[in-house]
A protein has these predicted regions:
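NTP/phosphate- and nucleic-acid-binding module
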Residues: 1-403
Length: 403
């Protein structure tokens, strides 16, 4: 069983301390959310599960944690300055703004007016000035994805942790997109976290690795408690493919608001390393890339014959927040108790559960029992099990159900 509506999940998340509207006491900020005591535990556990499967359980992946502020050179060379945009439409009457794909028919969803502007590109990246003088000459972007920092660190990682193909670089971190219309709770927001792996392979083996990573990623979501019946694979084709992609498979999930992307696995070919490398003309780059005159590193690897080649890249990219939403939805249960009342129960996989253990004395006014419970809690905490709590309400049944 899953939640019947997004409203049920939103109400539960606020009531139980999972997720709150950001800056709520001042009216809130659209598209921004804060994780509460239980939410941050669930989120951290999901990230830890991903990191374990991608890095700790493999011999061919290294991890990094790169800066959020990203130079114009990086995002200009990658194509983000030119192409990282959504088509924007304005209503001439009520002044509301919409993504083109949100306009059903020819009328404004807000006021019903047919007086709409033609779609125009709206760049989704946030800018910020660097240094004490804000004259527009020195600025950086808040990164719109974690991937580019991985590509620009390709040589650093190889020099410090040598690998042969295939190998990968993983990262979990914040990204920012100035969404035109954030919506559906934490599904589409302006500040979010990504879990991304860039897996470098030899050209010619990329199709095989793309299939392999798609299978691995589907299985990982099943291991997090996602019901297989709630997952579909979407094979992106034609004009829907990103400019850098040879092939993309989206893992689609049945969220309360509908079937939407949970994770994408893209074959990015040699576009990214080819965009950021120096000596482009010597490297037989297959993708169409911008000429690079500023890069100081050759982002390539030598083959068996000592010839330089640029690896192809397979990228599994998942949103942490979307993952939290999917896991919450799957965990949602409604039960009818003895008095006929409905209660909501969350049934998480043990490794994701926000609370790992609860110590509950049978009697709240028994000093010896409470003291023993407190000592037991301390011993459990020393095991680094995770979040351990002491619940001393005296109502054993209610406390047991709560945790």
């Amino acid at each position: 069983m899953t939640a019947k509506s997004m409203e049920e999940l939103v109400a539960l998340c606020k009531r139980r301390g999972f997720i709150f509207q950001a800056n709520e006491i001042y009216g809130g900020l659209q598209g921004l959310y804060d994780y509460g005591p239980l939410g941050v535990e669930l989120k951290n556990n999901l990230k830890a599960s991903w990191w374990s499967s991608m890095v700790y359980e493999r011999d061919d992946v290294e991890g990094i944690d790169a800066s959020i502020l990203t130079s114009q050179d990086v995002l200009g060379q990658s194509g983000h300055e030119d192409t990282f945009s959504d088509p924007l439409i304005d209503c001439k009457d009520c002044k509301a703004r919409w993504r083109e794909d949100e306009i059903k028919g020819k009328n404004c969803p807000s006021c019903g007016s047919p007086n709409l502007t033609e779609p125009r590109p709206f760049n989704l990246m946030f800018k910020t000035s660097l240094g004490p003088i804000d004259d527009g000459s020195s600025f950086a972007y808040l990164r719109p994805e974690t991937a580019q920092n991985i590509f620009t660190n390709f040589k650093n990682v190889l020099d410090s942790s040598p690998h042969h193909l295939p190998f990968g670089i993983a990262q979990i971190g914040k990204a920012f997109r100035n969404e035109i219309t954030p919506r559906n709770f934490i599904f589409r927001v302006r500040e979010f976290e990504q879990m991304e792996l860039e897996f470098f392979v030899q050209k010619g083996s990329d199709d095989e690795w793309h299939k392999k990573w798609t299978d691995l990623r589907v299985q990982w979501w099943l291991d997090q408690g996602i019901n297989e019946d709630n997952i579909e694979l979407l094979y992106v084709t034609g004009n829907e493919l990103a400019h850098y992609s040879k092939a993309t498979v989206d893992i689609m999930y049945k969220f309360p608001h509908g079937l939407e992307e949970l994770e994408g696995i893209a074959n990015r070919t040699d576009f990214d390393l080819g965009s950021h490398t120096k000596f482009q003309e010597d490297l037989n780059i297959n993708s169409t890339v911008k000429q690079n005159t500023k890069s100081k590193s050759r982002l390539a690897i030598q083959d068996k014959n000592n010839n330089w080649e640029i690896p192809y890249v397979i990228e599994p990219s998942a949103g942490v927040d979307r993952g939290v939403l999917a896991v919450l939805n799957e965990a949602y249960r409604e039960e009818i108790v003895d008095n006929g009342k409905k209660r909501v129960v969350l049934s998480f996989k043990p490794h994701l559960a926000p609370i790992k253990a609860a110590v509950i004395p049978l009697k709240r006014n028994d000093e010896n029992l409470v003291e023993t419970a407190s000592k037991l809690k301390l011993e459990l905490q020393k095991t680094k099990l995770g979040r351990v709590i002491l619940e001393n309400t005296g109502n054993i049944g209610k406390s047991y159900r709560k945790h």
